[in-house]
């Protein structure tokens, strides 16, 4: 078993986790960030961001449907779900790349695995 010392170990690389890691690094702490999947967490990859992108597609559709109320003659819009899905995927990937770049550009040790508290001042990691 390998042991490393950190001032702060963050379990979970979602929005709160990476924000905590960034703040700790800014305070000159030695930081490890443990993430079992992809930095950004559920919010970025399967939750908040993908849902908001699809809601934005629906909002644009609604705006086009209501365009006639403003004197704009627009034909009935049709949502191409494959295009909406591709846009959603591209947005998620762009944000993921940005977060990954930020983590890599700071003095944060990214550990890919599942972390759990293992006693006073100890974290155990099951690596992927």
PLM region spans:
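Beta1/beta-strand and adjacent pyrophosphate-binding region of the FAD-binding site
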Residues: 2-16
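Glycine-rich flavin
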Residues: 3-6, 22-29, 34-128
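Short alpha-helical segment within the catalytic ATP-binding CA
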Residues: 19
């Amino acid at each position: 078993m390998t042991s490393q010392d950190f001032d702060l170990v963050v379990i979970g690389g979602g929005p709160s986790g990476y924000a905590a890691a960034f703040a700790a690094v800014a305070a000159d702490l030695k930081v490890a960030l443990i993430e079992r999947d992809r930095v950004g967490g559920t919010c970025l990859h399967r939750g908040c961001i993908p849902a908001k992108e699809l809601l934005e597609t629906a909002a644009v559709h609604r705006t086009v449907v209501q365009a006639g109320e403003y004197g704009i003659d627009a034909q009935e819009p049709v949502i191409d779900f494959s295009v909406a899905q591709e846009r959603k995927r591209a947005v998620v990937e762009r944000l993921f790349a940005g977060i990954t770049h930020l983590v890599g550009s700071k003095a944060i040790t990214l550990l890919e695995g599942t972390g759990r508290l293992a006693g006073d001042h100890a974290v155990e990691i099951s690596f992927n």
